[in-house]
């Protein structure tokens, strides 16, 4: 499996393959980095949704259970997960979506770090999941608190029962004892994520009949277990390969699409729209770009946290991703639809997007107002940590949000999201920059991106007069050159680029040669070679001013100690 005894011996040490919280991309077969509790529940819901969408793209007409793309998503959650809001949000949506391919085990050991869960957690979790629309079962290893027996047969029977329920996700409450069978520690909070000590280890080994020496492993037994698993896996793989080969031969178009999606490649002739001079908000432009990309990229799908009309996240003609019984004349669609209705669940949306992305074949986006991105920040951070290409669409990006006032004005958000390592924050200045931004984002497969868009109409820059928007792909570019050797450089993003261009006209009229730079993405610009960066922001020009409708934090790097920021 890629892990050896030495890796277990280095558990929770710097640079090991066995950190305290397993990391995607570091350790083989780790399917997601959960870390914060509840994140994995949302990831699992996303994976189950992705499995349904992938089947719809590749094998929609196959009878249930016969497609090579039919599979189950299994998740394990604990008492802490059940208390986290993201798990509640995601579980609610999973019930609404009738995700019969999702089976979740709840390790009900009634212990968290501070002690017995009774001090903070008292609801009937089974009833809660029944209310969400899940199929619920209970397997009690404690036999009502009398004796402890890990009844694997009962657990397997529950799994088999879950598979017979195809119109509901399944929730299996598994009542256990934490730390069993460690003498004096089983059932206590002291064993939750803490070392049990030499005495505890010795007592456990005596209880289990092991030798009392460090890492006493019967290597012959290990080899036997590995061989047994390999043999079983080989047989299962042969059955699946036969089924897949039959599908592949019968579906050449689907096979070609699958090959492209597995390679994470875009069509060679991917086309994005261009926009004539005029006025258009970048959120509206984004909607137009999505509608243009839709027919070219069937793997691209997504939606909004109840703000689709404002976020412009619905592709033209895209049906809803919904069970048949929830579709209507207003919301036509089906289980293989393309438009996701996340509901008012920003945090779950972020985790679900990550789960869909981790599933590996499709690309997904989710939208909300930029100010509400605070509700999904942990999921965004995890996407950056995992280096996965989730796409976050955030509209209403500044004080220009309309009548809602300070609660909806995201003045600090640009700086705070730029502070997350590995996250691209892209704030295009007009419709054409938005188109190039979208194309560049879908070209990247190794990092997430936040696309930050305006509510209000912005001037669509006349590209016959100013530089091409293709410079967006490099993060920053000279949109308007000075009339002579520049004395001043104005740097603008988003809605403030047009302000910078107006300011240039006044400065030039006063005889001050002024260059205007559009910098929609600091992260992309920082990746450019030094020669290009120097060509855009020559070190000889120290009179620099950044203009952005947000706090100035982070701009000193670009304007320098002699520059200034209008914020």
Regions found by a protein language model. Give the residues of each.
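Short, flexible loop/turn elements at secondary-structure junctions
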Residues: 15, 77-80, 143, 176, ...
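Short glycine-rich or small-residue beta-strand-to-loop segments that form or flank ligand, phosphate
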Residues: 31-33, 74-78, 137, 338-340, ...
């Amino acid at each position: 499996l890629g892990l050896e005894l030495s890796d277990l011996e280095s558990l929770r040490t710097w640079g090991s393959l066995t950190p305290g919280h397993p990391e995607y991309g570091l350790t083989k077969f780790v399917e997601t980095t959960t870390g914060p509790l509840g994140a994995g529940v949302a990831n699992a819901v996303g994976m189950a949704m992705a499995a349904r969408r992938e089947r719809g793209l590749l094998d929609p007409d196959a009878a249930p259970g016969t497609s090579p793309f039919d599979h189950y998503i299994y998740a394990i959650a604990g008492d802490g997960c059940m208390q986290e809001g993201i798990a509640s949000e995601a579980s609610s949506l999973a019930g609404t979506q009738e995700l019969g391919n999702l089976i979740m085990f709840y390790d009900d050991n009634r212990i968290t770090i501070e002690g017995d869960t009774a001090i903070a957690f008292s609801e009937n979790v089974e009833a809660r999941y029944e209310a969400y629309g899940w199929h619920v079962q209970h397997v009690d290893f404690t036999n009502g608190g009398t004796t402890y027996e890990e009844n694997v047969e009962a657990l397997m029977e529950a799994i088999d029962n879950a598979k017979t329920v195809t119109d509901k996700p399944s929730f299996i409450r598994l009542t256990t004892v934490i730390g069993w069978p460690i003498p004096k520690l089983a059932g206590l909070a002291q064993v939750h994520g803490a070392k049990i000590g030499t005495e505890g280890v010795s007592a456990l080994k005596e209880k289990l009949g092991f030798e009392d020496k460090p890492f006493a492993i019967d290597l012959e037994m290990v080899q036997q277990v590995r061989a047994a698993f390999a043999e079983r896996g080989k047989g299962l793989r042969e059955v699946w390969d036969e089924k897949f080969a039959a599908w592949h031969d019968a579906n050449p178009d689907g096979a070609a699409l699958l090959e492209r999606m597995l390679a994470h490649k875009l069509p060679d002739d991917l086309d994005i729209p261009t926009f004539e001079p005029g006025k258009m908000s970048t959120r509206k432009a984004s909607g137009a770009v999505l509608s243009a990309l839709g027919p070219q990229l069937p793997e691209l799908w997504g939606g909004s946290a109840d703000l689709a009309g404002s976020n412009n996240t619905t592709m033209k003609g895209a049906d809803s991703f919904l069970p048949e019984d929830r579709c209507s004349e207003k919301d036509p669609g089906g289980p293989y639809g393309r438009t996701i209705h996340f509901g008012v669940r920003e945090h779950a949306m972020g985790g679900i997007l990550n789960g869909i992305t981790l599933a590996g074949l499709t690309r997904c986006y989710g939208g909300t107002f930029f100010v509400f991105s605070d509700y999904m920040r942990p999921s965004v951070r995890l996407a950056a940590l995992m280096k996965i290409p989730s796409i976050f669409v955030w509209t209403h990006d500044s004080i220009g949000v309309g009548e809602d006032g300070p609660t909806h004005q995201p003045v600090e958000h640009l700086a705070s999201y730029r502070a997350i390592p590995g996250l691209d924050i892209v704030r295009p200045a007009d419709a054409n920059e938005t188109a190039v931004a979208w194309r560049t984002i879908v070209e990247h497969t190794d990092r997430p991106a936040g696309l930050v868009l305006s509510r209000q109409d912005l001037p669509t820059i006349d590209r016959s007069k100013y530089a091409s928007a293709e410079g967006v792909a490099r993060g920053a570019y000279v949109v308007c050159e000075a009339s002579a050797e520049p004395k001043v450089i104005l740097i603008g993003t988003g809605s403030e680029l047009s302000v910078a261009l107006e300011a240039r006209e006044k400065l030039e009229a006063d005889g001050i040669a002024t260059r205007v730079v559009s910098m929609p993405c600091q992260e992309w610009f920082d990746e450019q070679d030094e020669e290009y960066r120097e060509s855009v922001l020559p070190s000889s020009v120290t009179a620099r001013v950044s203009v952005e409708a947000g706090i100035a934090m982070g701009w000193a790097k670009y304007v320098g100690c002699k520059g200034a920021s209008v914020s």
